[in-house]
Amino acid sequence: TGLMPIQVQAMTLAHHLANVSWAQEATADLTATTPRHHGGWRFCPHCLGASGGTWLLQWRLMWSFACLQHRCLLAEYCPRCGRRQRAPQPLNAAPPRPVHCAHPSPTTTGRNRSRCDADLADTPVITLEADHPTLLAQQVLVELLAADSGRFGLYAQHPTPVRDVLADIRILGRSILSATAGRHLDGLLP
């Protein structure tokens, strides 16, 4: 590739591995990075369209759910075929067009099916006000993932490793959803 190993590593999620892995030993296996991850990438249609199809690595992390630049929730599914994006493709598949869905068209059958090819830049997303709690939470997580420890809220007096803060957030989130069955979430989104 002509790149130094450190340059290649910077283009991967390896720098997040120690903070987001709950495996006993951190490995380069992406499934260890995001246990029970849904298998696709979320994405900001505005970012995809503006960049000509560049997928940001941060979208792969389960902690990414909103685009701070465009103040919207990230999309997860193709607007035409309804499938999650960036799933593994067959080895014999032709490279997909940037910004377009690479999944086989839902209206065709057979081995050499045409692609869905929907323009992902046209995917509708929920836009949020600049001070919406979801965007504030995403900003806190972005800053946390870039740090060596959590130093906000209850962690301000006792800096805590990022991995432990993320584990606390997961446990708290699961507990809230379990206790309320999600009943109180309706008023949080526009």
Descriptions of predicted regions:
Residues 1-63, 68-190:
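C-terminal accessory regions
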